[in-house]
């Protein structure tokens, strides 16, 4: 469709190099989004370009792409390890040696701002607690070094303990302390038990195995939408830090493709003009995350953002993609 005319039989192509400028694919259910991505990944595999697919919803990629030779699938159900789907294991507190601890800490708190409803002093309390958790694990926040000489990192359980300390030392009213404790501690504690306790661990997958190979991360069995968003955000954060550390002078060429399916789980549309401190904070954090994705093109990273409706995504996400592939949409978006 061009200049209000339909040109039938036209072949339209896109060079793999264009993917470094990022791509947005949208269309309603059954319009061909997944098949379009399959074709992109097929061409990437032919050219030996590694890729990472993060799928939070239907679990189709593990069946369609996960069975290709050389593709590794990570999931969230330990029972599926016998079927060749390895357990996803992430350490949110680990960061590359070239990254300063305070850089990582700021980005980590921004991810929480996107994924959890945060208001009033909650982000400041969480950040203070995370800082204290790192210090208790032996980290010097200025030098970005561990006094024990080893890469020892805190856990969510450590952060829970520190939140209680921060609140006890604060001058908030009893009601506010109760609200903050109920909101922050309950969410953080939920990440230390059950399946979440198996996912968020110090015994995590090496970055090279996640970001330098052909990988599917299937989150379709995760029940909580907040946890899905958190895992997606942490993977993007770790990818950004890993690419920055491995950056070379010849980063103009495509080195890796990341596919974000159902991207609104992480990059949801939240106007920064909305009334309410929480909405305003989420909007700013989403925009910051979208800008981080846009900047990764300088590392040879190409993002493919996929969603059913453009209206669900923050406008900065769509604005930062060079190629738009628009399939059938039920309404004007």
Report the location of each language-model feature.
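Conserved lysine of the Walker
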Residues: 33
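Short, glycine/polar-rich helix-capping loops at beta-to-alpha or helix-loop-helix junctions
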Residues: 60-63, 308-316
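N-terminal pre-Walker A segment at the start of P-loop NTPase domains
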Residues: 1-12
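Hydrophobic positions on the alpha1 helix immediately C-terminal to the Walker A/P-loop
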Residues: 36
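A short helix-turn-beta junction within AAA+ P-loop NTPase domains corresponding to the substrate/partner-engaging
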Residues: 70-72, 316-328
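Pre-Walker A (Motif I) flank of P-loop NTPase domains
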Residues: 10, 18-23, 212-215
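The conserved Walker
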Residues: 25, 29, 310
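P-loop NTPase motor domains
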Residues: 41-294, 298-301
